[in-house]
Amino acid sequence: GLFSVVTGVLKAVGKNVAKNVGGSLLEQLKCKISGGC
């Protein structure tokens, strides 16, 4: 029903947010390691 749809949307959004946050953290780490900040 509607609840499962909402749950699915929230999970998808959560995955995207986690991916974006993780990606930016990785970029910052690469930047610091390479000294290009």
UniProtKB/Swiss-Prot annotation:
Principal place of residence:
secreted
Read off the Pfam families from this record.
Antimicrobial_2 (PF08023)
Task: List the GO biological process terms.
Answer: defense response to bacterium
Alphabetical keyword list = Amphibian defense peptide, Antibiotic, Antimicrobial, Disulfide bond, Secreted
Its tissue distribution reads: Expressed by the skin glands.
Q: Does the keyword Metal-binding apply?
A: no
State any GO CC term: extracellular region
The chain's disulfide connectivity reads: 31-37
Location relative to the cell: Secreted
State the function annotated in the UniProt record: Antimicrobial peptide. Active against the Gram-positive bacterium S.aureus (MIC=15 uM) and the Gram-negative bacterium E.coli (MIC=30 uM).
Protein family membership: Belongs to the frog skin active peptide (FSAP) family. Brevinin subfamily.
The name on file for this protein is: Brevinin-2DYe
Q: Which organism is it from?
A: Rana dybowskii (Dybovsky's frog)
Question: What is this organism's lineage?
Answer: Eukaryota, Metazoa, Chordata, Craniata, Vertebrata
